[in-house]
Amino acid sequence: MNIHYTTQFKKDYKRIKKQNKNIDRLKVVIEKLVAGKKLEPKYRDHRLSGNWNDHRDCHIEPDWILIYRIEDEELILERSGSHSELFKK
């Protein structure tokens, strides 16, 4: 499976690195998704609704999430960050 990083995800990734988050935790999740493995329950992987209804959300840490979707054997990484950063109204 190929990986596509959206422009917004790239910006999120830079912000996460500046926050000194453990990037290895994110890499582990991405590797599992690319391999087609089901994520363990601790990641709380689930479908989103509303404007994000064709996306999934999993928790890297309790308040650090990854929003992604899989289309035609391609993993598309959309966003990553805290709930307040990603879902602010």
Predicted feature residues:
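Nucleotide phosphate-binding site architecture
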Residues: 10, 49, 87
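Alpha-helix C-capping/helix-to-loop hinge sites
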Residues: 12-16, 55
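Secondary-structure boundary motif
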Residues: 15-18, 35
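A short, surface-exposed loop/turn module that caps and links secondary-structure elements
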Residues: 32-59
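Residues at secondary-structure transition points
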Residues: 20-21, 43, 55, 81
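Basic, amphipathic "hinge/linker" alpha-helix immediately C-terminal to the N-terminal HTH DNA-binding motif
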Residues: 5-9
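Enriched for short, Lys/Arg-rich terminal
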Residues: 2, 14, 21-24, 28, ...
